[in-house]
């Protein structure tokens, strides 16, 4: 059999060699030369960050895959040219299908590569990145064995780049100049930096955004242009002047204020409004019945509701038009999920030359009130447990007319032992549960709830009940609920506060086998026994990945959980000692512990193809007072999808655990202290595929 495989391989290799020897130029049009590829020679290569970006752009401008390569140039086999030569003569039938399938694109000729145009484009790229003295040339190299085939050699001499010496803002109105000068510290172009048009365009966009956030509604980046002078400071330096374009419209040179607002709410099937009402300065037009509370519409559209500073709310400045606020309004309304279509327009209140007020017009179509979701999955675990699962959820949107959503979700799963042990064919584990949650798109809390955050904020109330059956071991009933406030005061910081979190676990049934295991491991039994866990939790997250110009982002999250302390304090007020164990609530002892968990991640982008990701995590769990052992569900483990992904749960580190034939292998092994760190080298394999 081995000899047969070797012979087949030899035949294939010989066939490839013979096919490669076949001429690929026998059907070329008269006067055309087949393009075989290109090579780029870089002289005086720049090593600056801007230079590396320029080289990437240059490679893209000069690159052209020849017809003499297979699969986009991965293999040096003229497959497409064979197809073209053999099937170009067919007009129908199988031959035409083969041509259309494998050789429909015409061969690449030197004339279609247009090396002259590519040289001009590359020269302009050098100018764009500050290489004003750079030169680009090309040479056509004819194949010595076949004069109808030729390649191209490009020579790029980058020479020395130019750097920015000074940047001036000139010829704008005094008020505009004051705003521009105040924002100069955030400029994308500064003295000493290498000249490049990308930063120049970003600077125009930055200034335009700055002005539009201060009322300049009609201002645009195209209303500014640069003047550059390379003679003032010799030695490769440029003096820049940013000036307004000739004929700058008068409307773009003054701030505007926000006036009245009108809202047109269409029915879910597009029915036009047939009724209206006034709420303060908000004119609401709606179809049949108003499905949104007027005060919520006013809150979302009124600028003063977005300002959390009392002095700013009292000043007239809050009425200034702001591009940032406009984007926030559109984002908030979109996140509600109650509209299938939405459009917001700003227009002058009148046509007079002195008009400085913009009225808002909003048009929106209501979405269908119900959403349904079905999920199916199959799970295979390392302890030979396998089985399917499913969940079905229904969400009712805009329950109280303020963007609230009510969700009900059912879930179920079962597993069976797939190993060859006793009773392995029986379905021996199952789980079912139901949960419901009510989510408000704002902070529902006295005083805090009167103001809006610039970024998403939600309040969630949740109740659930789950039944878990581990055949031959135990049956566990869990139910509870929580109230959680999530808000984001800045772009990089997020807070999650859970002032009330209740978990009640009832161990309904214990088998003889489970009791034997528990006798050998009392801590296991205590962690699974009836438990009442009243807890509070706070989580802070810092993430600067969305911040512009952050090259190496960091992510940090810390969580503090306190359980049973408020309950123990109440018992203490009624005469029960604080450190007395065994105190019960609703017939079950309540847990008392403190838990701290923190995790830090850093991503170092070495270049566009290589990254190093590092991660450090630390956690500690202390049980005291009414309980000496922390609940099983709150303990730590290392490995798995949410930890170090390359290892299964509890299979790495000094606490590694490998339950090969243990009768306890169905239980995850956990601990009360956690420390883990790992470093990953990530490299680009192909386009968006990383290793």
Task: Give residue ranges: language-model regions.
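C-terminal outer-membrane beta-barrel translocator/porin domains of Gram-negative envelope proteins
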Residues: 279-287, 379-383, 496-686
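C-terminal motif of bacterial Sec signal peptides marking the signal peptidase cleavage site
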Residues: 18-21
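Amphipathic hydrophobic-ligand
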Residues: 131-136, 217-221, 386-390, 432-434, ...
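Strand-connecting loop/turn motifs
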Residues: 131, 216, 369, 401-403, ...
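Short small-residue beta-strand/loop micro-motif enriched in glycine and branched aliphatics
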Residues: 164-165, 306-309, 370-374, 417-419, ...
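Interaction-mediating elements
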Residues: 2-3, 23-335, 341-347, 357
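Gram-negative/organellar outer-membrane beta-barrel architecture
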Residues: 176-179, 290-291, 321-557, 645-659
């Amino acid at each position: 059999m081995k000899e047969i495989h070797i012979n087949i391989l030899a035949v294939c290799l010989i066939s490839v060699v013979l096919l490669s020897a076949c001429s690929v130029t026998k059907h070329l049009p008269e006067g055309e030369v087949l393009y075989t590829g290109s090579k780029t020679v870089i002289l005086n290569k720049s090593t600056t960050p801007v230079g590396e970006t320029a080289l990437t752009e240059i490679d893209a401008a000069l690159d052209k895959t020849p017809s003499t390569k297979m699969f986009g140039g991965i293999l040096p086999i003229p497959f497409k040219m064979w197809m073209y030569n053999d099937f170009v003569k067919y007009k129908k039938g199988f031959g035409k299908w083969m041509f259309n399938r494998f050789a429909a694109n015409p061969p690449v000729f030197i004339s279609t590569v247009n090396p002259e145009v590519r040289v001009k484009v590359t020269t302009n790229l050098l100018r764009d990145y500050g290489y004003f003295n750079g030169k680009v040339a090309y040479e056509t190299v004819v194949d010595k064995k076949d004069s109808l085939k030729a390649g191209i050699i490009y020579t790029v001499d980058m020479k020395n780049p130019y750097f920015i010496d000074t940047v001036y803002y000139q010829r704008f109105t005094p008020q505009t100049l004051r705003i521009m000068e105040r924002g100069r510290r955030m400029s994308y172009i500064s003295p000493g930096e290498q000249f490049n048009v990308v930063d120049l365009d970003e600077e125009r966009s930055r200034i335009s955004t700055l002005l539009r956030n201060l009322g300049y509604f009609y201002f645009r980046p195209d209303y500014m242009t640069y003047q550059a002078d390379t003679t003032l400071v010799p030695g490769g330096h440029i003096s820049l002047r940013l000036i307004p374009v000739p004929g700058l419209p008068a409307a773009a040179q003054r701030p505007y204020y926000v006036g009245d607002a009108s809202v047109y709410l269409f029915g879910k099937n597009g029915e036009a409004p047939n009724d209206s009402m006034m709420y303060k300065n908000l004119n609401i037009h709606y179809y049949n019945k108003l499905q949104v509370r007027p005060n919520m519409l006013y809150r979302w559209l009124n600028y003063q509701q977005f300002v959390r500073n009392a002095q700013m709310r009292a000043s007239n400045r809050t009425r200034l038009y702001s591009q940032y606020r406009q984007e926030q309004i559109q984002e908030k309304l979109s996140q509600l999920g109650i509209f299938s279509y939405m459009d917001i327009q700003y227009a002058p209140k009148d046509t007079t030359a002195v008009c400085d007020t913009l009225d808002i017009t909003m048009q929106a179509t209501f979405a269908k009130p119900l959403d349904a979701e079905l999920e199916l999955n199959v799970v295979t675990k390392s302890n030979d447990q396998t089985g399917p699962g499913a969940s079905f959820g229904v969400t009712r949107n805009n329950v109280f007319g303020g963007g609230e959503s009510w969700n009900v979700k059912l879930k179920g799963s079962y597993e069976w032992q797939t190993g060859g042990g006793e009773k392995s064919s029986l379905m021996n584990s199952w789980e079912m549960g139901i949960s419901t949650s009510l989510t408000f798109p704002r902070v529902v809390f006295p005083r805090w709830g009167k103001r809006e955050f610039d970024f998403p904020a939600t309040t969630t109330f949740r109740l659930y009940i789950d039944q878990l059956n581990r055949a031959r071991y135990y049956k566990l009933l869990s139910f509870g609920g929580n109230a959680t406030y999530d808000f984001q005061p800045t772009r990089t910081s997020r807070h999650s506060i859970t002032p009330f979190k209740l978990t009640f676990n009832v161990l309904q049934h214990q088998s003889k086998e489970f009791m034997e295991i528990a006798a050998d491991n009392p801590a296991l039994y205590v962690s699974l026994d009836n438990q009442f866990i009243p807890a509070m939790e706070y989580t802070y997250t810092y993430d600067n990945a969305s911040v512009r110009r952050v090259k190496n982002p960091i992510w940090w999250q810390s969580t503090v959980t306190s359980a049973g302390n408020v309950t123990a304090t109440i018992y203490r007020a009624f005469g029960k000692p604080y450190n007395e164990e065994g105190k019960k609530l609703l017939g079950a002892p309540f847990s008392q512990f403190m838990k701290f968990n923190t995790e830090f991640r850093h991503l170092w982008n070495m270049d566009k193809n290589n990254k190093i990701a590092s991660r450090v995590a630390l956690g500690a769990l202390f049980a005291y007072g009414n309980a000496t052992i922390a609940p099983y569900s709150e303990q730590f483990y290392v490995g798995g999808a949410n930890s170090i992904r390359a290892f299964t749960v509890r299979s790495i580190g000094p606490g590694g655990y490998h339950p090969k034939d243990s009768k306890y292998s169905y239980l995850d092994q956990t601990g009360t202290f956690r420390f883990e760190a790992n470093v990953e080298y990530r490299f680009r394999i192909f386009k968006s595929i990383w290793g």
